[in-house]
Amino acid sequence: MMNFYVSTAAALAVASTVLAFTGQSHATAFAAWQVAGVPFGDTLNVRKYPSNASQKQAAYPNGTILQMTGKCTGGLNLLEIAGKPNWKQKQAIRYQWCQVWHDPAQNGGFVTGWVYGKYLVPY
């Protein structure tokens, strides 16, 4: 009988751990958006702060997939618009700066930066 209780307790512990990590990963999940609409021969700049005058961290061409943190200027949260059609999502961020998680040096040193939403589409 003791083995039954130990097995049940172990199964519940594993299940609760899996559920905790599942919920946690959903809360911290990044949304993938793609760079698009940048003029030929140009790139989308990632800035340290949400401003054209801010320090440039990196630049990405059309087709690059960026990982968004979900936070945009104007109080916009990408998780709140995630269920809408792509055109409505794009329209919502068109004039906003959105935060990305990227690796400008491509050495595993990920940092946050800001990109202008006009050049992003949901991926």
Each language-model region and where it sits:
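Long, non-globular low-complexity/IDR segments in eukaryotic proteins
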Residues: 1-32, 42, 119-123
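Preference for short coil/turn "hinge" residues that link or interrupt alpha-helices
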Residues: 12-14, 39, 53, 108
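Beta-loop motif signature
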Residues: 31-32, 38-91, 101
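Boundary regions of SH3-family modules and the immediately adjacent low-complexity/disordered segments
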Residues: 23, 28-33, 55, 84-123
